[in-house]
Amino acid sequence: MASGPEVAEPGDALIVNVGKSSIISVRDEDGAIRGFHNVCRHRGVRMSPEGARMSGNIVCPYHSWTYGLDGKLKFYEHMGEDFKPGCNSLKPVALRSIGGLLFICLSDNPPGDIDEMARVMEPYLAPHNVREARVAYQADLIEDGNWKLTMENNRECYHCGPN
């Protein structure tokens, strides 16, 4: 989904769309990275657009419901006496950092083999030291075209310069 350095400091957050789901990854005050669905539990409003960055609390733009970096509801208004804020935390997403890369699973029951995947991947990722990397520049290039052509174009060398 992303890399750990994209949420380098406590309070940093990154929003990424994965299929039809929008996910917020945040680094909490203890340095752990957490993942949540980018949907307010009040009226189902998407809290931030893809690519947005925020710092600190997660605030819904619709009615200002405010969530902490742990996903727990911190602020709300005009709810009945029987309202239970503890039952209205952000819905978590299984998130794991492996070698500095962030992996998510949207299933309510994530597969149990993530530890095996981490064991296999860590040695390959370790030489790249992704955990210490910093984003120096980012650009989006959007092209109209078939993705298969883009991939195939990079698999042969007809466009390489002569040696």
Predicted features along the sequence, with ranges:
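Rieske [2Fe-2S] iron-sulfur-binding subdomain
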Residues: M1-A32, T66-N163
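Glycine-rich active-site/cofactor-binding loop and its immediate structural neighborhood
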Residues: D12-P61
